Swiss-Prot record:
Organism: Human coronavirus HKU1 (isolate N5)
Post-translational modifications reported in the UniProt record: Specific enzymatic cleavages in vivo yield mature proteins. The precursor is processed into S1 and S2 by host cell furin or another cellular protease to yield the mature S1 and S2 proteins. Additionally, a second cleavage leads to the release of a fusion peptide after viral attachment to host cell receptor. The cytoplasmic Cys-rich domain is palmitoylated. Spike glycoprotein is digested within host endosomes.
GO CC, one annotated term: viral envelope
Chain's gene name: S
Protein name in the entry: Spike glycoprotein
UniProt key word NADP: no
Length: 1351
């Protein structure tokens, strides 16, 4: 798709470059195009077209093409003049961008003049710069036909046409050319002159211009297509000039309505005649997207996820390297010196700008095609560099340049790389300006005399065959050798130093003596002995010149003025020449190779955009050096860009970062978040209700395009549009479920107005598929009623687990292990075939498996896992930045404590005392009234107690009471009772406090001792477990030691020493003994390898289990019981251990259970079933509730914890009773069967005892883990249940005389401050602003008197 926005340069501010006329031109008419009130209505096919050569019957299909946007406006570009033309008519907005194309709705103005029907409308012009270097398409009505031409017109500066019906005082003038312009297309088309409206559909795609037309019906039909190879950037409608006629008779009006096209997807409906009867623009509305998604013009009721109408980029970021020079490719291509195919030339262009449209205009192009590259993508793209090769084309060899050809031009001159992204340009230059440069590029050809060709100016040299030689090649024979030749004596000469003479042999036949036989006869092309000829025929490679032409060595020797080796011109073979001239022009081939597409600074500037500011934090369209997309730019600090790099990619090739050369800032590019849009559509409604999931309406309104709706609100699911918020209303059935218990309900318009008078038929309501009370009234169990236990309380447990994930690698030199360095053993071992190779192969596989296993474990640990090197099971410590304090909550006596303010601490004396449970209750009882002291006596374990601290008031009161009782006995004896009770109760309070403290001390001592014992046992078990881990490591070494010990085993031979065997026995017997030893050692080695295979299987399984536990236990919380520890998983920690991983799991285990009645499901009203979701239905007090499976927590049954069933039936499957056959077959007696085969045969079996010490050690940490578990239980049981002794703070008020002293001191302070301010000069300025509140004695009596007089 072409998206071309072409900005005319200031030097081309007018249309065309030739003033056809200067008369009656002004700039007074400031008319602007009218905007239509009607919009593009595609429902009847307006704006669509019939695809070329395709017929569809009775079908609905999606089609992507160039269409107008549904609902877009038209612009009227028709202009009508009489005498004057306005210069403003030839500038924007009348001069418009063509971009992808336009759709035109043209009024056919019909007028009868002198009984003659005239059909008139304006002429449209589509082109680029409108001069004779580019093609311009003109569509002009003329006498009832359409004249359509595509020529290289020289357009007038102010072009116009004239009326045919009324005439015009102006002459039609819109182009002027000194000769007939070059045209690609000229054709006349008829049209219906009686039609009221004509419709035109013009668009361009990949350099091809398409035209469609209709005068009856809305969809247009194919008119013509034309390959231009260039981009059409602008169009305008030429003014139509007519003679001025009075307005009452002038009923000729012009209307030329135009709307732009873009690449869009349409849903088209074809009837039984293949006619388009309905169409939908898929991206014009939410409803249209649903229609296209379902490929139906009447979608069914449902909820649809939409992808369109989401992201609305608010800006465009465009970047190119500024101030780069022009590549000037056209200057190099038009150079008059043109090379031949033999010495083709190459030029590399980089860090520059080029304009492909201009290039193709400035070069006389015959054809331009591309390979592995869409040539439309070149416009506006950037590359690392552009490599351009060129040479003149021999006329007879033009076909050799077809891609994949094996003709002479590509096999022996220039090879076209069909795997690269390239374009092939065929062009020509005028004959008078061309000089063909024929030059031999071969260095070894030129060494021996051939560097240029003596041909005419337009003859082009090319190679038929190419040859390569060694650097020491010389075509001349050695004179000292050939001087003895009697016949066939070749020419000879002295070869250059460092080269080899031509190979010649002296031969004698029956008739001739000393006959010379030399290489490469008769010539290198048709030599008899190609293997001995040093000139090798080759095919040129990509980017290579021909290495050299062939040399007839019989014509190389001493020449005139050349004493050294020299070849005559006719000695060089395998080349031809032909003319490049055709129609007085020389044909040239050029190959453009585009390197690094969208990754460099060699850019096409056809689009002529300017660099823009970078908008951050919002969704934008971007074009970064040819790479386009949408994203959100966020400025970051990055130091990983080199000076020549500016784009950052991810592993999938997507651009994720950008360095701006203009500002030297770096950005990360994030995808535009659009959210998920769900459309709830009710069949036959005019529009759907929309839910932008997880987005606020404020974000939707500001960043996402949508059709304006008066109803929108934020919900739990996201922003809801075109619906009314009625979540307080619930429905039991729903066709438009939105999830999470919400529903979109649709009410018919008539009933809606009667009930609520709202304008939206959609309501956002709560979905409740059943009523809980109804369920309890009519419920029946499904599958029966069962009794199970569900946990109610838990305790935390710890569990340590070691998993072996690797082992030491082992490699064995099998031959050395069996035979050491004895040759006889090695010879005999070779007869065992590939046994040793198999052993090494198996061990290599074991080592590879260890590497893979370690890599898998490392990858699992590297992603989000913190390995600890100092783990501790004590929860009060931190493990590598893992702080458990926030998980433990508040610990100690300060939890929940409150304190008074700083002022209260200043004004009162604070006293703290221990509280075993009665001080706070006493304080609450008194409420601050000290007279209620004895009324608030507390009881502690049956003993009356009071707090042991008294205030000054209480001491005074009780002292007075005791004094009165002592002064007037017995009448005042009763006054001493309160004093006695007060003393006794407070002594009781001290006693019980000391008793509790004593008991707590004993509990602390016992629990601490028990905790120390448990900790000791736990560390002992951990130490034992680590010792077993160490034993696993030692076991591998022990296995190797056992294997080495087998070297000293005789395995039935007379000795384990090969030297002793050889010295004691003869050759044959020695071989037998060595063979026994080899068999034994190979058997031991085979056993060891088998053990290694068995061990690696266990290690691999352990590694897989470790990876699974890292992923499920360490990185997340496992739902499986007893998988991560014992019980329900809480968290797990992992640390490295020798050849494995050590896990520490924390879990909670049930300590108490509740027995309940459960049912697998419930049946509602006999026809509808529900099943629990991750829990149980329990029967509690004749009512059904739901609880989770891992913890007893009853809650009401709702749609969030149930799964619905279609019926209440239960399908039972009976397991078949199948037993494995464990009977033992009845075999014949072994001795009897053996005797049948070995009658009268006696043999003594050798003693092949094999003392195997290879043992596979498995970890058995069961006992240690049990000890650790018991220690943990012991620690849990050692919890110190102390009697709670609180700390109570009591504030004692000061006596009255202290307060009196404070007040007196404060008054004295104020008086001193007052006299300081009034009696010194320090406060005069302040008091003058207070209107003389204090009189001053001196200097201002007049003012005082005057003020008194005024009063």
């Amino acid at each position: 798709m072409f998206l071309i926005i072409f900005i005319l340069p200031t030097t081309l501010a007018v249309i065309g470059d030739f003033n056809c006329t200067n008369s009656f031109i002004n700039d007074y008419n400031k008319t602007i195009p009218r905007i239509s009130e009607d919009v593009v209505d595609v429902s009847l096919g307006l704006g669509t077209y019939y695809v070329l050569n395709r017929v569809y019957l009775n079908t609905t299909l999606l089609f992507t093409g160039y269409f107008p946007k549904s609902g877009a406006n038209f612009r009227d570009l028709a202009l009508k003049g009489s005498i004057y033309l306005s210069t403003l008519w030839y500038k924007p907005p009348f001069l418009s961008d063509f971009n992808n194309g336009i759709f035109s709705k043209v009024k056919n103005t019909k007028l009868y003049v002198n009984n003659t029907l005239y059909s008139e409308f304006s002429t449209i012009v589509i082109g680029s710069v409108f001069v004779n270097t580019s093609y311009t398409i003109v569509v002009q009505p003329h006498n009832g036909i359409l004249e359509i031409t595509a020529c290289q017109y020289t357009m007038c500066e102010y072009p116009h046409t004239v009326c045919k019906s009324k005439g015009s005082i102006r002459n039609e003038s819109w182009h002027i050319d000194s000769s007939e312009p070059l045209c690609l297309f000229k054709k006349n088309f008829t049209y219906n002159v009686s039609a009221d409206w004509l419709y035109f559909h013009f668009y361009q795609e990949r350099g091809v211009f398409y035209a469609y037309y209709a005068d009856v019906g809305m969809p247009t039909t194919f008119l013509f297509s034309l390959y231009l190879g260039t981009i059409l950037s602008h169009y305008y409608v030429m003014p139509l000039t007519c003679n001025a006629i009075s307005s009452n008779t002038d009923n000729e009006t012009l209307e030329y309505w135009v709307t732009p096209l873009s690449r869009r997807q349409y849903l088209l409906n074809f009837d039984e005649h293949g006619v388009i009867t309905n169409a939908v623009d898929c991206s014009s509305s939410f409803l249209s997207e649903i229609q296209c998604k379902t490929q139906s013009f009447a979608p069914n009721t449902g909820v649809y996820d939409l992808s369109g109408f989401t992201v609305k980029p608010v800006a465009t970021v465009y970047r190119r390297i500024p101030n780069l020079p022009d590549c000037d490719i056209d200057n190099w291509l038009n150079n008059v010196s043109v090379p031949s195919p033999l010495n083709w030339e190459r030029r590399i262009f980089s860090n520059c700008n080029f304009n492909l449209s201009t290039l193709l205009r400035l070069v006389h192009v015959d054809s331009f095609s591309c390979n592995n590259l869409d040539k439309s993508k070149i416009f506006g793209s950037c590359f690392n560099s552009i490599t351009v090769d060129k040479f003149a084309i021999p006329n007879r060899r033009r076909d050799d340049l077809q891609l994949g050809s094996s003709g002479f031009l590509q096999s022996s001159n220039y090879k076209i790389d069909i795997s690269s992204s390239s374009c092939q340009l065929y062009y020509s230059l005028p004959l008078v300006n061309v000089t063909i440069n024929n030059f031999n590029p071969s260095s070894w050809n030129r060494r021996y005399g051939f560097g240029s060709f003596n041909l005419s100016s337009y003859d082009v040299v090319y190679s038929d065959h190419c040859f390569s030689v060694n650097s020491d090649f010389c075509p001349c024979a050695d004179p000292s050798v050939v001087n003895s030749c009697a016949k066939s004596k070749p020419p000879s000469a002295i070869c250059p130093a460092g080269t080899k003479y031509r190979h010649c042999d002296l031969d004698t036949t029956l008739y001739v003596k000393n006959w010379c036989r030399c290489s490469c006869l008769p010539d290198p092309i048709s030599t008899y002995s190609p293997n001995t000829c040093p000139q090798k025929k080759v095919v040129v490679g990509i980017g290579e010149h021909c290495p050299g032409l062939g040399i007839n060595e019989e014509k190389c020797g001493t020449q005139l003025n050349h004493s050294s080796c020299f070849c005559s011109p006719d000695a060089f073979l395998g080349w031809s020449f032909d003319s490049c001239i055709s129609n007085n022009r020389c044909n040239i081939f050029s190959n453009f190779i585009f390197n690094g597409i969208n990754s460099g600074t060699t850019c096409s500037n056809d689009l002529l955009y300017s660099n823009t500011e970078i908008s951050t934090g919002v969704c934008v369209n971007y074009d970064l050096y040819g790479i386009t997309g949408q994203g959100i730019f966020k400025e970051v600090s990055a130091a990983y860009y080199n000076n020549w790099q500016n784009l950052l990619y991810d592993s999938n090739g997507n651009i994720i970062g950008f360095k701006d050369f203009l500002t030297n800032k770096t950005y990360t590019i994030l995808p535009c978040y659009s959210g998920r849009v769900s459309a709830a559509f009710y069949q036959n409604s005019s529009s759907p209700a929309l839910l932008y999931r997880n987005l606020k309406c404020s974000y939707v309104l500001n960043n996402i395009s949508f059709i304006s709706q008066p109803f929108y609100f934020d919900s739990y699911l996201g922003c809801v549009l075109n619906a009314v918020n009625l979540t307080s209303y619930s429905v039991s059935s729903c066709d438009l479920r939105m999830g999470s218990g919400f529903c979109i309900d649709y009410a018919l318009p008539s009933s809606r107005r009667k009930r609520r008078g709202i304008s939206s038929p959609y309501r956002f309501v709560t979905f409740e598929p059943f009523n809980v009370s109804f369920v309890n009234d009519s419920v029946e169990t499904v599958g029966g009623l069962f009794e199970i236990q569900i946990p109610t309380n838990f305790t935390i447990a710890g569990h340590e687990e070691f998993i072996q994930t690797s082992s030491p690698k082992v490699t064995i030199d099998c031959s050395a292990f069996v035979c050491s360095n004895y040759a006889a053993c090695h010879d005999l071992l070779s007869e065992y075939g590939t046994f040793c190779d198999n052993i090494n192969s198996i061990l290599n596989e074991v080592n590879d498996l260890l590497d893979i296993t370690q890599l898998q474990v490392a990858n699992a640990l590297m992603q989000g896992v913190t390995l600890s090197s100092n783990l501790n099971t004590n929860l009060h410590s931190d493990v590598d930045n893992i702080d458990f304090k926030s998980l433990l909550g508040c610990l100690g006596s300060q939890c929940g404590s409150s304190s008074r303010s700083l002022l209260e601490d200043l004004l009162f004396n604070k006293v703290k005392l221990s509280d075993v449970g009665f001080v706070e209750a006493y304080n609450n009882c008194t409420g601050g009234s000290e007279i209620r002291d004895l009324l608030c006596v507390q009881s502690f374990n049956g003993i009356k107690v009071l707090p042991p601290i008294l205030s000054e008031t209480q001491i005074s009161g009780y002292t007075t009471a005791a004094t009165v009782a002592a002064m007037f006995p017995p009448w005042s004896a009763a006054a001493g009772v309160p004093f006695s009770l007060n003393v006794q109760y407070r002594i009781n309070g001290l006693g019980v406090t000391m008793d509790v403290l004593n008991k707590n001390q004993k509990l602390i001592a016992n629990a601490f001792n028990k905790a120390l014992l448990s900790i000791q046992n736990g560390f002992t078990a951990t130490n034992s477990a680590l010792a077993k881990i160490q034993s696993v490591v030692n076991a591998n070494a022990q296995a190797l030691n056992s294997l080495l010990q087998q070297l000293f085993n005789k395995f039935g031979a007379i000795s384990s020493s090969l030297q002793e065997i050889l010295s004691r026995l003869d050759n044959l017997e020695a071989q037998v003994q060595i063979d026994r030893l080899i068999n034994g050692r190979l058997t031991a080695l085979n056993a060891y390898v088998s053990q290694q295979l068995s061990d690696i299987t266990l290690i691999k399984a352990g590694a897989s289990r470790a990876i699974e536990k890292v992923n499920e236990c360490v990185k997340s919380q496992s739902p499986r019981i007893n998988f991560c520890g014992n019980g329900n998983h809480i968290l797990s920690l992992v640390q490295n251990a020798p050849y494995g991983l050590l896990f520490i799991h924390f879990s909670y285990k049930p300590t108490s259970f509740k027995t309940v009645l459960v049912s697998p499901g419930l049946c509602l009203s006999g026809d509808r079933g529900i099943a629990p979701k991750q829990g149980y239905f329990i029967k509690q007090n004749d009512s059904w509730m739901f609880t989770g499976s891992s913890y007893y927590y009853p809650e009401p049954i709702s749609d969030k914890n149930v799964v619905f069933m279609n019926s209440c039936s239960v399908n039972f499957t009976k397991a078949p009773f199948i037993y494995l056959n464990n009977s033992i077959p009845n075999l014949s007696d072994f001795e009897a069967e053996l005797s049948l085969w070995f009658k009268n045969h006696t043999s003594i079996a050798p003693n092949l005892t094999f003392n195997s010490h290879i043992n596979a050690t498995f970890l058995d940490l069961y006992y240690e883990m049990n000890v650790i578990q018991e220690s943990i239980k012991s620690l849990n049981s050692s919890f110190i249940n102390l009697k709670e002794i609180g700390t109570y703070e009591m504030y004692v008020k000061w006596p009255w005389y202290i307060w009196l002293l404070i007040v007196i001191l404060f008054i004295i302070f104020l008086m001193i401050l007052f006299f300081i301010c009034c009696c010194t000069g320090c406060g005069s300025a302040c008091f003058s602003k207070c209107h003389n509140c204090c009189d001053e004695y001196g200097g201002h009596n007049d003012f005082v008197i005057k003020a008194s007089h005024d009063d």
